[in-house]
Design a protein with these regions (language model features):
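Large, well-folded core regions of big proteins
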Residues: 1-224
Length: 224
């Protein structure tokens, strides 16, 4: 199964390239004239991870996406009408950190935002961890919860409480808090056993579980 999926990645990348707009962002639907913020972050993350795992990724597409992300980061303003607006910003920052181009100033500004959502807090902590600042990530996590209220969002971040728990799970893995990660992993597994799940839940849960398995199986756990 893994080999089959791996062989599909080059074709998937080619299909994703076709959704990139002149702005560097990516459309949710093929042919749409508008970039979707969350989808742009997801596709960017996929491209970065593919590149890090040895796949050939278009440098031009990736560079254009990075410029789009950085502009969106700088243009970000809080939006009281949409509570998870900060989560979108945190995801942008995470993807840029993953690419090795962290926007440290924007990360610090978002961290100091009053009433930062729990979802944004977890994702931003991941960004700090990926950027090599695990001490800051750990400080943030100490004040975050995992008891996300049940919800299912059909737009914006396409979120749900199981997806958000998966984000928290990966954050705990990144900061090497394996006991906490194991606890959340059980909750994520229970949520995913209900028989149906959203694409976001599958994507984030699979990635987080794989990260946890990698740490546990290799013993690659470091302390600062």
């Amino acid at each position: 199964m893994v080999t089959l999926f791996s062989s599909m990645i080059p074709d998937i990348l080619q299909q994703l390239y076709q959704r990139q707009l002149g702005s560097g962002g990516f459309a949710y639907w093929p042919g749409s004239p508008d970039a979707n913020s969350w989808v742009s972050s997801m596709i960017g993350q996929f491209m970065v991870m593919a590149s890090q795992n040895g796949y050939s990724v278009s440098k031009g597409v990736l560079a254009s996406w990075a410029r789009y992300q950085k502009k969106a980061v700088q243009d970000y303003r809080t939006n009281p009408d949409y509570p998870l607006w900060d989560f979108e910003q945190a995801y942008r920052l995470y993807t840029l950190a993953l690419k090795g181009e962290p926007e440290n100033g924007a990360m610090n500004r978002l961290k100091e935002t009053e009433n930062l959502s729990q979802q944004a807090g977890w994702m931003l902590a991941s960004a700090y961890a990926v950027a090599g600042k695990k001490n800051i990530a750990k400080e943030m996590v100490a004040n975050l919860r995992t008891d996300f209220a049940e919800y299912a969002e059909s737009g914006r971040t396409f979120g749900s409480s199981p997806r958000d728990k998966a984000v928290a799970l990966e954050t705990d893995v990144l900061i090497d808090d394996i006991p906490a990660a194991m606890d959340i992993a059980q909750e994520v597994a229970k949520s995913m056993s209900r028989g149906w799940y959203m694409t976001q839940e599958t994507a984030f849960a699979s990635k987080a579980m794989a990260a946890l398995a990698g740490k546990v199986n290799t013993g690659n756990i470091s302390a600062e």
